[in-house]
A protein has these predicted regions:
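Short beta-to-alpha loop/turn elements within the nucleotide-binding domains of ABC transporters
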Residues: 185
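A short acidic, glycine-rich active-site loop
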Residues: 158-167
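Conserved beta-strand->loop/alpha-helix structural units within folded catalytic cores of enzymes
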Residues: 176-177, 195
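Short helix-loop boundary/capping segments
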Residues: 150-151
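Short acidic, glycine/proline-rich loop/turn micro-motifs
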Residues: 154-158, 224
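Domain-scale signature associated with acetyltransferase and cell-envelope carbohydrate enzymes
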Residues: 1-145, 166-172, 179-181, 189, ...
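Alpha/beta-hydrolase-fold catalytic nucleophile elbow
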Residues: 194, 213
Length: 232
């Protein structure tokens, strides 16, 4: 009996039905929107919805993209902020944690693979291109920025440095809490990034099953994460 009551309470009070109906039918073709793939929890702020949302998945279903639920048992229920001027391509199941911020600039493209999880209080700021592969998990308070926000000049070479550089995170990456993934970061598949690390370069030649740690991050050991339900 308790389970049924709890389920009813969750449906009524936890799910943000105004946001669910508004966002799905505003941003998706009717045949997709009617399935309500976007599921919003608690508070959400739509700062800008001028961009495009493209779901590239044949199995679109109710609640496949969950926004604002992850981490709600641990952190204050601050609103998720959605700021989409550019294009967000979604290839599968996606979770965005409570209190997170998603920004995609007008000329930018954010691509997220299947089974991508952004933890609570994550900040993703896409000014050019951010690509996240399949089965990626970000812990809480991470930031993913493909921009420095300002131009800078190398005084030795007199060269103006690039402000924006793409980010590409490989599949089966696990990113610990409070990591900073900065512009130019590229990782191979099957990499762990230890908590409080800063990544800011191309790590594509790094062997799979490496652990990156530090600021800036470097390889410290080789280890494999076991995914519940897959490896255990």
């Amino acid at each position: 009996m308790y389970q049924y009551i709890n389920k009813i309470v969750t449906i009524i009070f936890v799910h943000n039905w105004i946001a669910i109906l508004y966002f799905n039918f505003k941003k998706l073709p009717f045949k997709q929107a009617i399935k309500l793939p976007f599921d919003f929890y608690y508070k959400v702020r739509f700062k800008n919805l001028k961009g495009k949302i493209i779901i590239k998945n044949e199995n679109i279903h109710r609640g496949m993209i969950k926004i604002g639920g992850r981490g709600s048992e641990m952190f204050p229920r601050n609103p998720v902020i959605i700021d989409i001027s550019g294009t967000w391509i979604i290839k599968g199941i996606t979770e965005v944690g409570i209190g997170s911020y998603i920004h995609v600039a007008s000329s930018a493209t954010l691509t997220t693979g299947n089974k991508v999880k952004l933890g609570a209080l994550n900040k993703l700021y896409c000014e050019k291109s951010i690509t996240l592969g399949d089965e990626i998990a970000f812990s809480w308070e991470c930031q993913i920025f493909d921009t420095n926000f300002h131009y800078m000049k190398d005084l030795l070479s007199n060269k103006i440095l690039e402000k924006d550089t793409l980010i590409n995170i490989g599949s089966f990456n696990w990113i610990g809490n409070r990591c900073s993934i900065m512009k130019g970061t590229i990782t191979p598949n099957n990499v762990i990034i230890a908590s409080n690390s800063l990544c800011n370069k191309d790590y594509s030649l790094t062997p799979e099953f490496s652990v990156l740690a530090g600021s800036p991050a470097k390889v410290v050991k080789n280890i494999k994460r076991l995914f519940e339900g897959t490896d255990i």
